Every structure is written in structure tokens, then in C-alpha cells.
A protein has these predicted regions:
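Alpha-helical membrane-protein architecture signal
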Residues: 66, 70, 74, 78, ...
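Generic hydrophobic transmembrane alpha-helix motif, especially the helices
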Residues: 119-153
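Membrane-cytosol interface at the C-terminal ends of specific transmembrane alpha-helices
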Residues: 140-191, 197-206, 257-260
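C-terminal transmembrane helix and the adjacent membrane-cytosol boundary/short C-terminal tail
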Residues: 201, 242-269
């Protein structure tokens, strides 16, 4: 018995050579990646700047933080929320017909393929690049940010909507069809109840992403709180930067908490 076990053990596939080769390749890639990181631009004052930023966050400019004019943090945060919210709504609305046209279980394969190619092309371009493009078209401001958020939302939301549509339970539609329901009744009682929770959850999740992206887009002049933040940091006004960052952190935490509650509610029905 022992001899047969040893013979079977000796005949096992020799995988250790392959595993060792993979480990060596991964180690070599890690070493090469580490050597590619440039540290020549790091200055001795970098630690001081980082400390000043942290000090500004914990000692923000309260006059700016509680300034309710158009130059204050509350107004800039409200503008950022509006850009993210409207961009999400517009993108979600555009994504619905585009997703139905790109769903392979509802439309012919060639049409669905073309729709998916369009969605993939939209998703390929980063939001930062879209922001620069729309600023050239509309000029700096919130409208450029709105267009950017809308287009970026279409790329992601359409993909999620397609997956939800292709996961539809067709047995429900077949039952309604056998019961003699009209097309509108099948949509009302068979399709919408299955899709709406998923659609709403996806839109809320995209709003979270857009809220952060809207801040970044402000750096290129597409409205929102990003531009005042970069101006304050470039001018070494750390208290102002701290006030903006403090307001932004509080806003993101509140929105994240609310959106999580809503998505959990939708998931549980």
C-alpha cells in the first residue's frame, strides 16, 4: 500500500516549477516598479507642507467655513452637490433607452453590439479629459461640470443597467402574457418592479462617485469647490484650504451615510 501511495505521489504533476517561475516574475515586476518611482522632486520642505495642510484642517478658517455668501464654503459645497446631482439625473435618464437598445435579450445582436461599443467608447475617456473638452466648448463654470458628469454617468450607469435588464426573470413576463396582459401592463407589473430597485441603487452609487469627481473637475475650472481649494493651496493659505477640506469631508460623510441607507433599503425591498 505504501509503495503504491509513494508511486502515485511521484506521478503527481510537477507544478512547483511553474509556481516558482510565477513568483520570480512577480518579484521582478515589484522590484522594477519600485525603481521606476521618481523621488528626485521630493524636497526637504515637503514634510513641513504636509504638516501645514494637516494643521489647516484642524484649525480651519471659520469665517470662510461659515460664510454663506457666494464665496463661502456652504455655497461652494451646494454648487458641487448640484453639479453631481443634475449630472447623475441626466446621465441616468439617457442611460435607460441606451441600455435597452444594448441589451442582447431584447434587441438584435448587431444593434446590441453597436450600443455596447458606444458605451465602451464613452467609458474609455477619463472625466478629467471630458472636463477640459467641455470647458473649451462652454467656457469655465458649472455648466461644463454638468455636461462632464452627465457623459461620465452614461458610461458607467448604462453598463450596470444592461446587466440588470439581461437578468430579468422572463417567466414573469410569460405568466403575464398568458394572462392576457397588454404591453403596458407587462411593463408596469413585470419589468419595472424588477428593474427600478436596481436602477435607483445604481444611480445613487453613481451620485457618490460624481460628488467626488465634481470636486476634482473644479481644479480645471468646471465649477464646484475644487478651484477655490487649489487656489488656496497654491497661495499657501492653509487655513482656507483646511476650511474647504473640512466642509468637503463632512459633506462626503453625510452623503455616503444617506446613500448607504437608501441602497440597503432598496436591496432589502
Amino acid at each position: 500500500m505504501n509503495n503504491r501511495i509513494e508511486a502515485a505521489y511521484e506521478q503527481r504533476p510537477r507544478r512547483w516549477v511553474f509556481e516558482l517561475a510565477v513568483a520570480l516574475v512577480v518579484a521582478a515586476l515589484l522590484i522594477w516598479s519600485g525603481t521606476a518611482v521618481e523621488t528626485a522632486g521630493t524636497t526637504q520642505s515637503g514634510a513641513t507642507i504636509a504638516w501645514n495642510i494637516l494643521a489647516g484642517i484642524f484649525h480651519p478658517d471659520t469665517d470662510l467655513l461659515f460664510n454663506f455668501t457666494t464665496q463661502g464654503v456652504p455655497y461652494l459645497l451646494l454648487e458641487t452637490i448640484c453639479i453631481a446631482f443634475l449630472g447623475t439625473i441626466v446621465g441616468a435618464i439617457i442611460s435607460i433607452p441606451l441600455a435597452f437598445l444594448s441589451a442582447s435579450n431584447l434587441t438584435p445582436k448587431p444593434v446590441a453590439f453597436v450600443g455596447r461599443i458606444i458605451i465602451m467608447a464613452v467609458r474609455t475617456v477619463p472625466a478629467f479629459v471630458y472636463g477640459l473638452m467641455f470647458i473649451r466648448v462652454t467656457g469655465p463654470g458649472a455648466f461644463a461640470g454638468l455636461l462632464t458628469m452627465s457623459l461620465c454617468s452614461v458610461g458607467m450607469v448604462s453598463k450596470m443597467y444592461i446587466e440588470a435588464i439581461e437578468d430579468l426573470d422572463v417567466r414573469v413576463l410569460e405568466s403575464l402574457d398568458a394572462a392576457g396582459c397588454t404591453t403596458w401592463q407587462k411593463i408596469r407589473y413585470g419589468i419595472l418592479p424588477q428593474l427600478m430597485p436596481n436602477f435607483a441603487s445604481t444611480a445613487i452609487y453613481r451620485f457618490d462617485i460624481n460628488l467626488r469627481d465634481a470636486t476634482v473637475l473644479g481644479l480645471v475650472g468646471a465649477g464646484g469647490i475644487g478651484a477655490p481649494l487649489i487656489f488656496a493651496m497654491n497661495a499657501y493659505r492653509w487655513e482656507e484650504a483646511g476650511a474647504i477640506l473640512a466642509g468637503l469631508i463632512v459633506l462626503v460623510l453625510i452623503v455616503e451615510w444617506i446613500s448607504t441607507k437608501i441602497r440597503v433599503k432598496l436591496a432589502r425591498g
